[in-house]
Amino acid sequence: VARVSLLDREQVLPGESSAAQLITEDPVVASVDSCFILRTYSPLVTVAGGKILMPAGERPKNRQMKAALLEYLDKLSEEPPLKERLLALINYRGIITAADAARMNEVSLVELMRAVSPFEARAEVGVIRGGEAVLLSKRKIDELGETLTKALALFHGEHPERKGMPAEECAKVLDLQETKFTRELLSLFEKQGIVKFADDRARLADFEPFDEELFSAN
C-alpha cells in the first residue's frame, strides 16, 4: 500500500506522464530502472505504471529543492550513461559522500571513482579524499569559495597581523561540522588558487600578513 505524490502537477490525465514519489506504508526493495504498476485498493483496478528512477527517494523541503529534484529526474529519464548519471546526481545534491553516490547508482566505489575521475580532472567535480570520500559539485565549490573569500577579506581587514583564519573558524564560517573535512576542503581550494592554506590557517591568495618584526627593524 502506498500514496502517490505528484511532483509537477495536481493530477495526471489518461495518456499523460509525470514525475512522482511513491510513499509506501512499509519498506520495500527496489532497484534502478525497475518497472511497476499501480492499482487501486478497492476495486482492484490497474490505473498507472512507471519506472523507478531513484530508489532511495527523498522528499523536497521547498520549491527550490523540488525544482532541482525534477531537473535531476528529467535527466535520469533520458537513461544517460553512468558518468552522466553521476554528474547529474552530484549537481543535484551539491555535496554527497562517494558511498551514498555509489549506493544510489548501484555500483561499487571503484566503479564510481573511475567514472568521476574525468570530471575531477576538468574541475567539474571536487573530490575530498580524507577519510570517507566526498564529492562536491562545481556550483557548491564556487558557493563555499565565495563565502570563505568574503569572510577572509573581513578577517584580514580586522587582523592584518595574523597569518590567516584558523581552520576551526573556517569550518564555522562555512557551516561545516567537521574540522578535518574543512582542512581537506581548504587544501582543495588552495589547489584551485582560491586561498592559501598553511600552518592550519587560510588566507586570501594575494594576502601577505603584516610583518611586525620587519616593521620594528626598520
Positions of PLM-derived features:
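C-terminal effector modules of nucleic-acid-centric enzymes and ribosome-associated factors
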Residues: 1-218
